């Protein structure tokens, strides 16, 4: 407390900013994931763990060859890579400027497993499908410890992790990705890429998801047919236009919620969340009118969060300032004590 006594004010490092742990809107590309990647090797297996701190997405996988490791790094395009300093890396990876060596103990399997149990509040990892992937567990635990060390705060929005298997998708090597010009064209123009042609998404969240799908084409025919049927239902009933129009008013809720969880949200994050929640009743009504299994399941799971919206509606001014220190964030009438100031 600055006013508690005389003498110098105690200063502490409250956060260490690194390329892979950015969450600020102004520092991120809203249509690209900002990934922190951890790499660990155990015997002949390579473990990878990728975290998008700005969105709360956490996934792991385990591969058996250096070629597969490099291919996954090429696909993920992480902003930062941390590696076990005791591991001998492939030459191409060792020269990567995004690389940061970390102590070997950070990736030790038992401590990493405990780190994950503590983060998720579980006794084991069987429910996540990674219990038999020790190299991936080491990478995931090391990554969480690194983030805890740099952010100096809890990570309540990291509630789960998913396991990715290369057998679930088409495997594209670096040369194939370049030749197909998925997201980078030889001309340097995004419009000349597959993403540039296909991306008509209404939200930043949708844009990021589309890029993940393009870079990891599924092989599961049942899932693909389900998505195709869903798209057909939207077009046949001419519902996609109205849904698209509603979604265009939606803020980047995924990243806003992460900033709220990390206690770094700004006033306009809260107003953006409020305005986005206001769209849910209309979206729910539109989705409920469509006879499609995938859309019906989505509609059934949609929570309008009426209580949260009501709180933000009465607590936050219509157009709050960018920074909290500028004042004028809390709406008149919400807190009598503030109204008197």
Segments from the language model and where they lie:
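Charged catalytic and DNA/RNA-contacting regions of genome-maintenance
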Residues: 1-233, 241, 245-261, 265-341
